[in-house]
Amino acid sequence: MSSIYDRTDIYDLLEDQTHWSAYKKHWKTLLQGKNVHSFLDVSIGSGSVTLPLCELGVQLAGSDLSEEMIRKCKEKAAAAGYEIELKSCDFRKLSCWEGKQFDCVASTGNSLPHVNNDDVLTALEQMNSLVKKGGYL
């Protein structure tokens, strides 16, 4: 079943340079004084929220349930000249990132409200398993 989250042709219609700048400012403020060099977004979507991290020197990685969103994110990253690792997987089962650890792991956007409370706990446990010691969830 298709959803808005697979409609990459319309998903980013409201995104523009103003939003990009706002996200970049947000991340700069949020991460100021933090030792965050690697960041995993487990619901990266088209990348609009977290791609600006690349401009701040953060090594970004991302995953998403929607392969269409991963494709769109790859296109946007390539167009901006960013090399990021992207994988298609569900944030409730992050085995696609097995063996990797990140300074910060997050689920950006509006993904967590789409699953029940037990699944939120599962997702948070999965995410926490990928956070480096002293890192951020």
Language-model segments: residues:
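Conserved class I S-adenosyl-L-methionine
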Residues: M1-K34, V36-G45
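Class I SAM-dependent methyltransferase SAM/SAH-binding core
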Residues: T50-K93
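A short acidic, Gly/Pro-enriched loop at the edge of an enzyme's catalytic core
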Residues: C96-C104
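A short SAM/SAH-binding and catalytic strip from SAM-dependent methyltransferases
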Residues: D103-D118
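A short glycine-rich, Lys/Arg-flanked "PGG" loop and its adjoining helix->strand segment in the class I
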Residues: L121-K133
